[in-house]
């Protein structure tokens, strides 16, 4: 679709069958046709090292360019030790460098956190938001999305098994679409 909004989806868990990946697929499935959500892998990004800025690895360059081309970013993250996974923090660092050339700058974004537990990865959600604000990414404030019991509300194919969670996420994605339009003008 020529008029679609290009959304880079960043799944913070590297496991192929992660609950975060399932949730990201489910979110994409309930988004309007105007949102084209592309899950961009982060597992192949070498750890950020400033010494590499003068001759960056090809995966860094490809990742940065993909983020730059996007209209918006959707982050879906679990919680590791009350924060975001290291792979996500590394992807954020890779995309933000070299200094003054951040691929993230000005990109509207939304954060969804999830866990099998009841708190829905609250700590990861807020640590991630703190980084995104610093990177000048307008983060959608409402609705907030903390999906607890995620293992019970999404199936292995990335579909919702709980109708109320599906409806909440449909509304979340609709709000995200409006947020993108608001920020991008």
Which residues does each predicted region cover?
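Helix-loop-strand module that forms the ligand-binding subsite of alpha/beta enzymes
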Residues: 56-136
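N-terminal beta-loop-helix "entrance" segment that forms/cooperates
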Residues: 42-59, 154
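Glycine-rich phosphate/pyrophosphate-binding loop and the adjoining helix
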Residues: 2-4, 8, 138-185
């Amino acid at each position: 679709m020529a008029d679609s909004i290009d959304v880079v989806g960043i799944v913070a868990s590297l496991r192929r069958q992660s609950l975060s990946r399932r949730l990201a697929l489910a979110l994409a499935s309930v988004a309007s046709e105007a949102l084209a959500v592309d899950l961009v892998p982060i597992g192949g990004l070498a750890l950020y090292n400033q010494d590499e800025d003068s001759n960056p690895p090809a995966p860094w360059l490809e990742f940065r360019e993909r983020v730059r081309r996007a209209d918006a970013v959707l982050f879906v993250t679990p919680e590791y030790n009350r924060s975001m996974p290291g792979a996500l923090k590394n992807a954020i660092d890779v995309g933000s460098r070299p200094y003054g050339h951040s691929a993230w700058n000005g990109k509207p974004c939304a954060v969804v956190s999830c866990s099998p537990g009841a708190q829905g990865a609250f700590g990861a959600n807020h640590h991630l938001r703190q980084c995104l604000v610093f990177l000048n990414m307008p983060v959608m404030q409402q609705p907030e999305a903390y999906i607890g019991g995620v293992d019970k509300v999404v199936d292995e194919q990335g579909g919702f098994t709980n109708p109320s969670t599906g409806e909440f996420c449909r509304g979340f994605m609709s709000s995200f679409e409006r947020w993108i339009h608001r920020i991008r003008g």
